[in-house]
Curated annotation (Swiss-Prot):
Cellular location(s): Membrane
Name the UniProt record assigns to this protein: Transmembrane protein 164 homolog
Family per similarity comment: Belongs to the TMEM164 family.
A Pfam family per the record: TMEM164
Amino acid sequence: MKYLIEVIGETFLSISDPIDHRHWFLSKEQHAYEFIFMNLFYLVVIFIGINLNKKREYENQRKPKPIPEKDYPSLLNKIVAIILAINVFLNLIYKCLRGWRVVFFMLQPCHIVSTIYCYCLLTNNYQFGRKVFKISIYYILVTIAALVAPDLADLTLPFECYNFFIQHYALLIAPFLLQAYRYNIEFELPYALISQGLFGISHFFVFEIFCFISGTNINYMLFPPPLGEFSYLTQESYRVGIAFILFILALGIGRLVILIGSKIRSTFLLKNKSK
């Protein structure tokens, strides 16, 4: 294990291109340990989720097939999708204006989830869109975190701050619209686990590697966000600690969004359609 840690640490050192003095806030050994164990943890979570889902699907084969949920076409869905698409495009322009390194920030969850929600809001492939939504609904926690503690220090270009808030409020609204007007899913633990497993691997594998290559702090994988009075969170364990906190919170908040969206659907849409 010690040799493996050394090899991974040296690999990170060889591909890294620092542009900030905090680039090595965590040691190469710390990065290597977390790269191995956190990715293993999230792979196990995905494996459990997939197997639970297979078991659930097998059990459902024996039951009568439910009547498919009705999709209520909504102009609001299209408006929110267009807003998200425009925001992603504007963010890409902003990043390109700052140089090739900054373009890697397009991997940030807000931009990826914006693209996913655009697809879910507009796709004609209802069944696949439903599965994608079952996974992506739990990422609303990232949106909430960004709105509660917005990091606007680097947003200096015209309209960039406004664009940030417009995008994130659209991201906040989108899951409720998708639940109320389109998919009306239920909380399913297998999909919740797959969701969090993918989220974790995107950080501790994909973001980790691209952070070293570009030198940019994608979703704070190199060094912590400005935490103010909570400076004790900036110790070496901040990534692991926040990862597990988000893991638990995402399941609870995702479930709450499902319940609220279903309530909106049953209270307003179904009653209005029955009149």
